[in-house]
Amino acid sequence: MASAEPLTALSRWYLYAIHGYFCEVMFTAAWEFVVNLNWKFPGVTSVWALFIYGTSILIVERMYLRLRGRCPLLLRCLIYTLWTYLWEFTTGFILRQFNACPWDYSQFDFDFMGLITLEYAVPWFCGALIMEQFIIRNTLRLRFDKDAEPGEPSGALALANGHVKTD
């Protein structure tokens, strides 16, 4: 049987970066529709989002692996949300020094320096829940088989409902 290895940290970072980038575009499109009823759904983000999300989710993955047996899900999501605020503030502050910060929350009632806003606490918390339960857990299950041939699976390794057949 082929030896399947877990994805490398760089491979997982890449998946997390692309996922975060996509979610950012979808969120801004939905926000534009809700606030302005814009049926064009123009979703936008910055290339910086790739680094920001990829790195942040990889760090949350490490938190998940350390906390999963030690504290309940809702507490973990609260910790991830606090991390998200710290990371968003830090990366925004650094990018602002180069006039490169792509977001500005100054128009929100509960913003801090225009870099973070409490109005996003519930979306960040829900995002943390989805991130742990679906994105991180499933990404950690992915395997890379360096000996696999390109093409459709066949024989003993044929897939059935997303699971490798072993019989």
Curated annotation (Swiss-Prot):
Residues 36-40, 95-109 are extracellular. The keyword Hydrolase does not apply. It is found in: Membrane. It comes from the Eukaryota. Keywords: Membrane, Transmembrane, Transmembrane helix. The keyword Magnesium does not apply. Its main location: membrane. One of its GO terms (biological process) is response to bacterium. It is a multi-pass membrane protein. Belongs to the TMEM229 family. The chain crosses the membrane at residues 15-35, 41-61, 74-94, 110-130. This is Transmembrane protein 229B. It holds the Pfam family ABC_trans_CmpB. Residues 1-14, 62-73, 131-167 are cytoplasmic. One of its GO terms (cellular component) is membrane.
